[in-house]
Amino acid sequence: PNDLHLFQIWLNLPSSDKLVDPYFTMFWTEDIPRVRRTDADGHTTEITVIAGAFDDAEPLTPPPDSWAAKPGSDVAIWHVAMPAGAHVELPPAGSESARVVYLFEGDGLEIDGHVIAGNSGNVVVPDRELELSATSGSVEALILQGRPLAEPVAQYGPFVMTTEAEIRQAILDYQETGFGGWPWETDDPHHGPTQGRFARHADGRVEEKG
């Protein structure tokens, strides 16, 4: 079986930043911080810190205009992997933030004593510690949190703006320029089955990890 999970997580931008220059960065798996917590029964939970500090673990630097880079955004993306029988407490978020626990692997997770269904998203109280327990098997979950922008959202296909007029303009821009110019001859270029890991940045710099 294919045990690969892919998540496409979108962070909205404030209206003032909707038209900033695009930016790309790569978070290599070996560079992403991980925190390990062992409970009283000897079970170790691993928290992968993709965004938002956890204990003393600081995440990698997000793109400069990302909402995650703004002071006070309270953005966190944590991947929590727990073996059967493990217990772990997560620190509170801000009182104005939204926090969701997405259980995507396993079905024996308790949140503060309440059993939640597998493959489900669960909104939790943000500003108190969160106690997670893997009661009947190993589980994996995403913790997603952040302070809402409190701005209108207009969305159509892959376009997310603040007003319908901005959506129409974004579609026109795409039709005219293909996201600023598509340099490849096909819509689905690839690098072949033998190409190792690499990242090509807008300034021409290439990172290779093999």
Stretch-by-stretch model annotation:
Residues P1-G210:
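Jelly-roll (double-stranded beta-helix
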